[in-house]
Structure formats: structure tokens, C-alpha cells
Amino acid sequence: MVGIALLGAGIFAREQHLPAIESVGHLNLKAVYSRSEEAAISLAKQARDRVDIYFDSPPTSGRSLDDLLARSDIAAVAACATILVQPLLIRKALRAGKHVLSEKPIAQDTATAMGLVQWYSSQSSPPIWAVAENFRFNESLRYAEMRTQEIGGELASFRLTYYGLIRKENKYFKTEWRKTPEFQGGFLLDSGIHFIASLRLLLRAVGQEPKEVMALSSLLKEHLHPVDTIHAVVSTIDSRHGTVCISFGVEHISTLEIEIISTRGVIVWTPVSVTSIIKSDSGESMNEKKEFIYNNGVKAEFEAFCQAILQNSPDPRQSPLEALRDLALLQSLLGSAACDGSMKLVKFE
């Protein structure tokens, strides 16, 4: 069994991390931590079994985060705090010798993320640090990746589209740190990073990575500042071009969709379906559609993290470097838009 602690008591920690931890047979939840005692107690009450609580306010002997990290029966932590707090928790836990599963995005910007990755890489035999990008564990996306590899061919073009609306009454918007974001991009960073990670996964399936971007952004709903919409042209390392259109500020709601067009066929992915159009050697097209029951992949990513610890072998889908590359692409989009569509390189090292 792997003793684990949950750091953070927000919505996603309560509704996703806690049940995921409790569903993985080799994980044993030992403790929870939040900055406030009240939040820590509230989270602990939701746990299936009794867990210890730790907090920093009010200061209480034996109940701080440092006290939690000093426990020898806790081998790992799941860090699910606000975007600006995450880097501090990651460093602190790794320095204490704990394996870490930290929520996406890896950090608020690439400078902070690169600093973390470089520091981690310089450590001698460090604990496992995994970044929780749960979309990489979505069953339909994994199937789309497999089909893209099977179809093969060279990339011709690609498309990512999502249109939706984050309303003022949305439970995630109601959190103070999202109402007044002190990080770039607002919901485009907080939620859009999932879409970017999914696009990169499918581009990698045809041997491509984004290289350059040109983007424009807008703010359609004032409460979603600084920006809620981005439209971009993205070029890959082999000079293939595609588009990225993401908005959290439009009433019209469309499903998330990624289309990969190669010289051998087309893959269209949504979270609940994968459509394959395969061009045969004779020139005929064969269509196939496979449907899925939606699963956000959170349980699967905790299972992968647990196995990584037990086998002492990090899962590449949770690599901090992959998370850094996700962030680098998104930051390049935002940076280009801030410069009225000027071309930006996707820098991640």
C-alpha cells in the first residue's frame, strides 16, 4: 500500500481527487491538508475512512504542512491547490522525499515551469513527480491516438475547436482565485490546457509538434477577464498548418473536437466518439465511428501514478516535460494574441 495525502480542499480535490484516491486499491489516504482548518475538516468529513487533518491557519503545533510532510507513513501527495500555489507545494513535497502528483497546468507560466523542471532534473534520485493531465487518460483520446498511428501517413492539416460559456453561476467561476485571476489567460489556461494537451497528443501520433503560432484573442464576457476566446493558426516542425479555436464566452455550445488530417485518412475526436476515415490503396474511403461513455480519466491517472510508485517507473503520460510543452504552446498563443497576432515560437527549453 502507498500512503498518500491530499493537499488542497477545493472543488476538484473534493469531487475528483478524493473519490479517485479511494477507488485505487493500492492507495491509502492518510491525511488531508488545506490552508484553513475549516476547509481541512470539511474535506476530511467527506473521506470514507478517518483521516488526519493539517492546516496552517490558525497556527497549531503538529498540524502544519511541514508536520504532514515529515510523516514516514506518507509516501506520496496529490497537490490540488490554486495555480499560483502549486509550484511551492511541489518543491516542498519533493524536498521532503514525497512522490508528487500535481494538477495541471504545471505552473502559471513557462518561466516558473522551466525553473521547476530544471531544478527537479538536477536532483540525485528524486521521488517521482507526475503532472495530472487527466485528458491523456481519457479512453476515447487514447483510442484516437492509436487509430492515428495505425492510419499513418504524413500530416496534412489539423483543427481544434471548442465553443462554450462559463456563466457567473458556474461553481468553478465562483472561486475567488478564478473571479480575479492573477495568472495569464484565465479559463483559457485553467481549462484550455486540457484541449492543448489533447491536440499535442494526437499531433505526436503523426510525428509532429507545434513550432510557431499566430493568434488573436478577445473578451466576449466581461466576467471572464482577461480573455475568454482565442483563434489561431499553428505551424508544426514540418511546416504543416492547422487552426485552434477556443472560447469560453459564447452562448452557442459545441463539443470539443480535434481533427487530424493525414495523407492516409482523417481522425475526428470528441470526448465521446472517434470517427476514422481511411483512404485505401485503391482510393476508396472507409468510414468507422466508435462511441464511448464519457470518463474524465481522473481515476486512471491516479492508478497510473500508484503503479509508477510501486514499479519505480514514471508514466510518460504524466511527464513534467510534457506538461511544460502543453503550457508553452498555450502561452505562445496568448503571447501572440497580446502582440496583435505576431508570430511566436513555441519555447519550452
From Swiss-Prot:
Which pathway features in its UniProt record?
A: Secondary metabolite biosynthesis
Gene3D superfamilies documented for this protein: Dihydrodipicolinate Reductase, domain 2 (3.30.360.10), NAD(P)-binding Rossmann-like Domain (3.40.50.720)
Q: What keywords tag this UniProt record?
A: NAD, NADP, Oxidoreductase
Give one GO molecular function term: nucleotide binding
What Pfam families does the database record attribute to this sequence? GFO_IDH_MocA, GFO_IDH_MocA_C
Q: What induces it?
A: Expression is induced in the presence of 6mM glutamine.
Highest taxon of the source?
Eukaryota
EC number, as in UniProt = 1.1.1.-
Please provide the Gene Ontology terms (biological process) for this protein: NADPH regeneration
What is one term from the GO cellular component aspect held by the record?
Answer: cytoplasm
Give the function comment from the record: Dehydrogenase; part of the gene cluster that mediates the biosynthesis of the gamma-pyrones fusapyrone (FPY) and deoxyfusapyrone (dFPY). FPY is an undecaketide and thus likely synthesized by the polyketide synthase FPY1 from acetyl-CoA functioning as starter unit and the addition of 10 malonyl-CoA extender units by successive Claisen-condensations.
What name has this protein been given in UniProt?
A: Dehydrogenase FPY6
Gene source species: Fusarium mangiferae (Mango malformation disease fungus)
Traced from the root, the source organism's taxonomic lineage reads: Eukaryota, Fungi, Dikarya, Ascomycota, Pezizomycotina
